[in-house]
Amino acid sequence: METVTSSDSSSAVENEHPQDTPESNNSVYTSFMKSHRCYDLIPTSSKLVVFDTSLQVKKAFFALVTNGVRAAPLWDSKKQSFVGMLTITDFINILHRYYKSALVQIYELEEHKIETWREVYLQDSFKPLVCISPNASLFDAVSSLIRNKIHRLPVIDPESGNTLYILTHKRILKFLKLFITEFPKPEFMSKSLEELQIGTYANIAMVRTTTPVYVALGIFVQHRVSALPVVDEKGRVVDIYSKFDVINLAAEKTYNNLDVSVTKALQHRSHYFEGVLKCYLHETLETIINRLVEAEVHRLVVVDENDVVKGIVSLSDILQALVLTGGEKP
């Protein structure tokens, strides 16, 4: 199997309940992650969808929607191994690459198999599947997610070769939050976003309410971000267009007209949309984490007192600060 696995930390299970002195509280979450394995996070039952690479791309995306999942491991029958992941990013890349106009059907989406798309997309730049063993530490998992700039990490049993679970930033942070009250609170948890400088505050990728979906897809491809704040003419955030919203084009079979505005494309969820989840630079890291976990979102939009966008704080930023850098800016 051509895969990249993260090596087990030598300290993976040395200490189930690390005893930190007050001076070393800043590393308490790092110690926790090093003392728990990926296996500890796997629920007793969860849905996992696997696609064979010979499946048609269109059917695969409809299956993602039907099953309510955002990604699926890809099984290559010829190689008898998992070779990659199919995600909403692939759907975006296909639409952006092949869309011509509302009058022309996207042949490649209708007819291509997953293996054909992978050959076109990867070409000569072969990327091995990044995965992890269930015995590896959660610290290794966080490191792998951030180092490889990925959002999903398959947990694959090295003996059977079976995919057991898919780890995400969201699931790891939720797991950490379950135990967070048992630890002495690190000093940095009471510091503000501004003090810690966590997040992205330069070259924020955004769209206007009138921006066509096709243009938004191009921004996703170019900037490699997972969401775009939607702003009015004064730069105030009024909505957010995420990669997950794009899969609705498949759900409603409206992917043949990408000239509509993001505002129109977002109308499908207006009946339950509670508004953009925001935060301020003066708010503490503890407040930010609580908001992210409780709302089960992947990022918060940082705004000023007028709701003008100042930055984005993602789950990746949070985990990097908590686990890899002990609250300090990397």
Swiss-Prot record:
The lineage of its organism: Eukaryota, Metazoa, Chordata, Craniata, Vertebrata. InterPro entries: AMPK_gamma/SDS23_families, CBS_dom, CBS_dom_sf. Residues 1-13 have a biased composition (Polar residues). Residues 1-26 are annotated as: Disordered. This is 5'-AMP-activated protein kinase subunit gamma-1. ADP 2 binds at R70, K170, S242, K243, F244, D245, R269, L277, H298, R299. One of its GO terms (cellular component) is nucleotide-activated protein kinase complex. GO terms for molecular function: ADP binding; AMP binding; ATP binding; protein kinase binding; protein kinase regulator activity. AMPK is a heterotrimer of an alpha catalytic subunit (PRKAA1 or PRKAA2), a beta (PRKAB1 or PRKAB2) and a gamma non-catalytic subunits (PRKAG1, PRKAG2 or PRKAG3). Interacts with FNIP1 and FNIP2. It comes from Sus scrofa (Pig).
